[in-house]
Amino acid sequence: SRRGFVNFLMGSGFGAMAVWMLYPVIRFLIPPKSGEPTIASVPVPWKPAEIKANSGRIFKFGSQPGILVKTPAGELRAFAATCTHLNCTVQYREEKQDIWCACHNGIYDLNGKNVSGPPPRPLEPYKVNVKGDQIVVSKGA
């Protein structure tokens, strides 16, 4: 009947409009899976003797930057080199012995703890293992 056909068209239109409006909300609530495989550890391209005390070097941990720091006392520490404020890459400042984000002047201590500026959280710590002349950095400090 004509009434059934009109009801079908109206219902279909409202249904399509509801899907059109809810799709972005659902995409926001359920983020897509990352295409990058999970990486547990990486070898860094330097030997322990090549890294002087009170220095830092940036390395790749998968597709993300990491920072390897040799403290003034000679201890190796590693962190995710992504600032927890707006994801800028951090760097080590030898003269101040801290990890610094140049984007908004965020400062982290040598334990990765946020000490000043806008960063809301500490840097993600990594575990450092020295095996002979090889330095291996792993997640899960």
Label every model-predicted segment.
Residues 3, 7-95, 122-141:
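N-terminal pre-ligand scaffold of iron-sulfur
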Residues 110-119, 136:
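A membrane-cytosol interface segment of integral membrane proteins
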Residues 107-108, 128:
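Active-site and channel-lining beta-strand-loop segments
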Residues 97-105, 115-124:
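Short cysteine/histidine-rich metal-coordination sites, predominantly Zn2+-binding motifs
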